[in-house]
Amino acid sequence: LHKAIRRQRQMCIRDRICTYIDSHFREEIHRDELAELVYLNTDYMSRMFKKEKGVSISNYILQKRVDEAKKLLCGSSIPINTVSLHIGYSNFSYFTKMFKENTGLTPLEYRRKFGEETHV
């Protein structure tokens, strides 16, 4: 019974963190503010999140940003530097590096390969 209660609590905490990140991923998010949100020690919260989601908090945020960038790159003609700013990266070079590490393509290459104009 105790394991079931603990598991339910961990799932609830994970869901609260994910909901917060999903709503605020365009902003700078710090682990300590997430820990305050769920009333946990920062390190414990990070370990628990990774155990529950299979990915670290920073990688979860990165994936949310990359997914949003993909949508914007494919579904609009918004300049790539504006896409970078929209998803929370003020440093365009860093955005390009993170995007390429995650997708294997630069944002421009991704747009050329998967953008709307290539499917017309």
PLM region spans:
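Single conserved hydrophobic/aromatic residue that forms the stacking wall/gate
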Residues: 1-13
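…primarily DNA-binding HTH/wHTH and HhH modules…
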Residues: 97-120
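Residues within the alpha-helical elements of helix-turn-helix
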Residues: 37, 86-87, 102
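Short hydrophobic/aromatic patch on the recognition helix
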Residues: 45, 49, 94-95, 99
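Terminal helix-turn-helix DNA-binding modules in bacterial transcription factors
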Residues: 19, 23, 51-90, 112-120
